[in-house]
């Protein structure tokens, strides 16, 4: 027999939960969101099923996580993925209505608690590229690509984005995230209306996650005296790009070309720079940047190094690529009611964090 015609039989053992709990898993990712963790979350949020039937609460949590990982698929097809490797086991075959009822029965509380446990810094003390001068670099950014069905209730809650030529076709959610720039690991997330032009409104809900030892990178959408003062009040240091309309007072010049100023009593250092970007075709684009920072020591944090650091803020933009690319593939989110949108942050975030923790499946 020719060698290229030879065959090999591969068998493997799969360990799953017993009985009606068997569909509750995420395959290889289950080790990062184990049964014990999910059961503890259900106990804490008092969402354990009262009677053990075909769809227990633990199975519901993993089903909702799978919905976040397969946003293009309907309920039945996502359930089929959870049960595809369970041939020979007496697993339930629920209707889509039963799965919708399971989702409503759980509510957002267990998913929110699970997200808060899983989200957090991923970098180890020895990880390179996650610190600047001993400070952990993090960044805020908003994603406005999450459209919801155009119903009266959704328009009342979210409004619609207004453009020069009219209103957007669908009400839109804003997903505000706080991420570690070196690993793109989520530290927290919050949902709000994209019709509110002020991104800082949603970002304020994430300020309790900041603490001394952090350096927050902000784009010019967050350049407001009140918000910058609130960030500084957490003990974290900040580096923000100023709007083109801001012209700070000069209180004193520093040897590296930066100067001192203040914003409503907040002492800051201003760094001005002109950046030239060269494209692959040789074309050049120039832009002027005015950076606001509370890194006051120009010897420890020289202006050229701070300007180079600001580029790291784009890491959170890359982290948002998954949300933008997946949401661009379909018209709107699957839920038609406000309560359903509150599930968005939790299953998607926890699933993404689990996938990032296991590089082979990222």
What annotation goes with each model-predicted range?
Residues 74-90:
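DNA-recognition alpha helix
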């Amino acid at each position: 027999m020719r060698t290229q015609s030879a065959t090999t039989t591969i068998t493997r053992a799969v360990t799953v939960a017993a009985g009606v709990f068997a569909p509750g898993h995420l395959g290889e990712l289950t080790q990062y969101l184990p049964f014990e963790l999910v059961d503890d979350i259900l106990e804490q949020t008092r969402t354990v099923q009262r009677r053990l039937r075909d769809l227990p609460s633990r199975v519901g949590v993993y089903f909702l996580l799978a919905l976040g990982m397969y946003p293009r698929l309907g309920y039945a097809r996502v359930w089929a993925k959870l049960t595809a490797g369970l041939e020979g086991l007496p697993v339930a075959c629920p209707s889509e209505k039963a799965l919708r009822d399971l989702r409503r029965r759980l509510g957002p509380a267990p998913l929110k608690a699970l997200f808060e446990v899983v989200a957090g810094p991923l970098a180890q003390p020895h990880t390179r590229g996650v610190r600047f001068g001993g400070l952990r670099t993090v960044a805020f950014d908003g994603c406005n690509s999450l459209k919801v069905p155009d119903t009266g209730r959704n328009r009342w809650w979210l409004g619609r984005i207004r453009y020069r030529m009219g209103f957007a076709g669908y009400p839109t959610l804003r997903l505000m995230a706080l991420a570690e720039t070196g690993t793109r690991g989520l530290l927290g997330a919050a949902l709000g209306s994209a019709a509110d032009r002020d991104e800082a409104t949603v970002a304020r809900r994430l300020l309790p996650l900041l603490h001394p030892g952090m350096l927050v990178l902000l784009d010019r959408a967050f350049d407001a005296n009140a918000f910058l003062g609130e960030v500084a009040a957490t003990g974290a240091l900040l580096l923000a790009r100023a709007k083109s309309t801001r012209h700070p007072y000069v209180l004193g010049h520093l040897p590296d070309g930066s100067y001192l100023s203040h914003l409503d009593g907040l002492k800051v250092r201003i760094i001005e720079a002109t950046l030239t970007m060269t494209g692959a075709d040789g074309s050049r684009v120039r832009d002027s940047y005015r950076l606001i920072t509370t890194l006051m020591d120009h010897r420890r944090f020289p202006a050229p190094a701070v300007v180079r650091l600001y580029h790291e803020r784009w890491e959170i933009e890359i982290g948002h690529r998954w949300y933008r690319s997946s949401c661009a593939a379909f018209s709107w989110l699957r839920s038609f009611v406000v309560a359903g949108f509150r599930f968005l942050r939790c299953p998607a975030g926890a699933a993404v964090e689990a996938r990032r923790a296991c590089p082979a499946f990222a």
